Amino acid sequence: MKLLILTCLVASAVAMPKFPFRHTELFQTQRGGSSSSSSSEERLKEENIFKFDQQKELQRKQSEKIKEIISESTEQREASSISSSEEVVPKNTEQKHIPQEDALYQQALEQLSRLIKYHQLQMEVVHAQEQFHRINEHNQAQVKEPMRVFNQLDAYPFAAWYYGPEVQYMSFLPFSSIPQPIFPEDAQNTEVMPEWVM
């Protein structure tokens, strides 16, 4: 009986929820009074909302920076294509001062574009190789003929001299007579009988 009570107590202790240390204060205030618990809940909600707003603001700023970098890189590409076709002397007033971070972002974007082009070329090569292999397999399948099956011994050119005439067309006993033992007719007159006949 004591063992049963002890196991029940242990099971209930294990089944109780364990609260993290930072929420023990909240758990104790809920037991103490409902007014303090509602204020702490509101405070936690406000903190979560504030953190969420900060994350949204950071994401928005990052997306704006990325858009600016992309637009600048496209403008520079267009300007470089125009300057390569026509010799235009850039004015100092038109040039923008690019901070070091923007230069790093620009280099990263250029590397990404080169990497994307490289992967596209590799994918095209792989696709061409697969297509070539498919065409080869298709052509080989059309050329191949099924192998002829030779059931007779003399179908091969070496069969005539390898197998003698008595071996080539040997008549075999039917399989139904195999279980019946074969022994000489005068087996009763002999003194020694085979073991398998007994």
Curated annotation (Swiss-Prot):
Coiled-coil annotated residue ranges, if any = none
Q: Where is this region: Disordered?
A: 28-47, 71-97
Q: Which residues carry this modification: Phosphoserine?
A: 39, 80-81, 83-85
Q: Which domain of life is it from?
A: Eukaryota
Q: Which InterPro entries match?
A: Alpha-s1_casein, Casein_CS
Query: What are the boundaries of the signal sequence?
Result: 1-15
| Tissue-specific expression | Mammary gland specific. Secreted in milk.
Q: Which GO terms describe its biological process?
A: response to 11-deoxycorticosterone; response to dehydroepiandrosterone; response to estradiol; response to progesterone
Q: Which family does it belong to?
A: Belongs to the alpha-casein family.
Quote the function comment for this protein: Important role in the capacity of milk to transport calcium phosphate.
| Protein name in the entry | Alpha-S1-casein
User: Which gene name does the record give?
Assistant: CSN1S1
